[in-house]
């Protein structure tokens, strides 16, 4: 029997129904399994009822359904007595469908029905579409058919508390939302429209196991490095998830130093969410919407890797979970102190062979003077700028090799209690013993944030 009395979440029987009571404070309503990808071949109905004399107000905070012309495929339908039903599908920026954006739905009576349909498919799991997250609330019904939200005592305009689905998301700005005369929910302190739920970074569900041999590589367990990306452009490379839509990587994986085609990259393929290459390929490529390479990167200068950093914006947000979580950005120089230990993970060459499993190594931040002396002894001409740092020990095995480029070096931030990507695998002198040289992410944090937060006239590669 799939008739359930719930207070906010649809469960996952193939066809199901729920009756929800709208109250003074907003409650969450999500698609089955949100924020994990929803399963094909199911249908859910939620009838939301308000007390006598009140209406139902519904606002979507997140919406990500598979797009289709006219929303004939997967869809959410909003219906209320006396009005035409509204069918929604797609996601932000979709060229197909009709996503709700920040639309507000208010019932004409005291009830509203939401129907979620995911059509049957040979592939039971959709293409990593996570469904929806909505807030519903009772609102005072007015004679003219309008509605006003319950007023928090002493609050003018009306206010509600913002909530996000943990543990993978948190409120961008904790506190209260208000509904002024514009009838759009805004952050009371900053005056912005409904704040987004932002991903929690740097906190894997599965702790990283200590490597008893200290040096050398170990096989990663699922969830150890949930930010790890596998890229395929001019060959295999790596990267790290930032937020739920961006990949941090090295510029030279996109525009290689030895390429005869300057500033012309091939198709960029990004795979996420597993520690096995074969399984990653089965999960499918995440299409890239935009490639942004740092302006200081000089592809034609073979001995200068300054500015070796790039960002890949994915077409769609990815559903976060134990195997797919973002890493954090650094915010202070103490994370680069000599002797501080960190981890590097990747799918690079090991003992001359390409690996199909994610490996990781524990390596220390090296003294800058030691790395400079090491380069001089070998008469190397590569630029070692202040935007770089080095990792490893001169006489110990350095397991980083071809195929690891773009992957990140992470250290534990004792103050913030999270893993931070301080470096990006950039260049080295062969594989084996010695030091590896990394892009210093701290030097580029302002640039990274500027690109990610850009809304107009954004830079392209």
From Swiss-Prot:
Residues 214-453 form the Peptidase S1 domain. The lineage of its organism: Eukaryota, Metazoa, Chordata, Craniata, Vertebrata. It comes from Rattus norvegicus (Rat). Residues 138-199 form the Sushi domain. One of its GO terms (cellular component) is blood microparticle. The gene is C1rl. Belongs to the peptidase S1 family. Glycans are attached at residues 265, 332. This is Complement C1r subcomponent-like protein. InterPro entries: CUB_dom, Peptidase_S1_PA, Peptidase_S1_PA_chymotrypsin, Peptidase_S1A, Sperma_CUB_dom_sf, Trypsin_dom, TRYPSIN_SER.
């Amino acid at each position: 029997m799939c008739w359930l009395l719930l207070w906010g979440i649809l469960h996952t029987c193939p066809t199901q129904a729920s009756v929800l009571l709208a109250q003074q404070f907003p409650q969450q309503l999500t698609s089955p399994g949100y924020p994990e990808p929803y399963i094909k071949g199911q249908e859910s109905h939620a009838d939301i009822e308000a007390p006598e004399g009140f209406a139902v107000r519904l606002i979507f905070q997140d919406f990500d359904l598979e797009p289709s012309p006219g929303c004939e495929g997967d869809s959410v339908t909003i219906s209320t007595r006396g009005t035409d039903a509204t069918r929604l599908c797609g996601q932000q920026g979709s060229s197909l469908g009709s996503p709700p954006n920040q639309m507000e739905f208010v019932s004409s009576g005291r009830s509203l029905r939401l129907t979620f349909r995911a059509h049957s498919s040979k592939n039971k799991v959709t293409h990593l579409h996570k469904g929806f997250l909505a807030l519903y609330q009772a609102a005072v019904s007015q004679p003219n058919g309008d509605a006003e939200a319950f007023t928090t005592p002493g609050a003018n305009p009306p206010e509600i508390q913002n909530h996000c689905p943990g543990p993978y998301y948190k409120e961008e700005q904790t506190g209260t939302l208000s509904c002024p005369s514009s009838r759009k929910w805004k952050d009371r302190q900053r005056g912005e429209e409904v704040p987004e739920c932002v991903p929690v970074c740097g906190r894997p569900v599965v702790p990283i196991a200590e490597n008893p041999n200290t040096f050398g590589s170990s096989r990663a367990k699922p969830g150890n490095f949930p930010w790890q990306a596998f890229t395929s452009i001019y060959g295999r490379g790596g990267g790290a998830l930032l937020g739920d839509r961006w990949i941090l990587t090295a510029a030279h994986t996109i525009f290689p130093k030895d390429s005869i085609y300057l500033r012309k990259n091939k198709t960029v393929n990004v795979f996420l969410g597993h520690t096995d290459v074969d399984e990653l390929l089965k999960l499918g490529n995440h299409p890239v919407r935009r490639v942004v390479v740092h302006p200081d990167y000089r592809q034609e200068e073979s001995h200068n890797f300054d500015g070796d950093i790039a960002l890949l914006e994915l077409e769609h947000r990815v559903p976060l979970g134990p195997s797919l979580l973002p890493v954090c950005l650094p915010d202070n120089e103490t994370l680069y102190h000599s002797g501080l230990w960190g981890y590097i993970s990747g799918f690079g060459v090991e003992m001359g062979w390409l690996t199909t499993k994610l490996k990781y190594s524990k390596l220390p931040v090296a003294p800058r003077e030691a790395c400079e002396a090491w380069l001089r002894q070998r008469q190397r001409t590569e630029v070692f700028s202040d935007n770089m740092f080095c990792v490893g020990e001169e006489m110990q095995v350095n397991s980083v090799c071809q195929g690891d480029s773009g992957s990140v070096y992470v250290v534990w931030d004792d103050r913030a209690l999270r893993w931070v990507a301080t470096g990006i695998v950039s260049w080295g002198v062969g594989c084996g013993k010695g030091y590896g040289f990394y892009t210093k992410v701290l030097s580029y944090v302002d640039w990274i944030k500027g690109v990610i937060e850009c809304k107009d006239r954004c830079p392209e590669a």
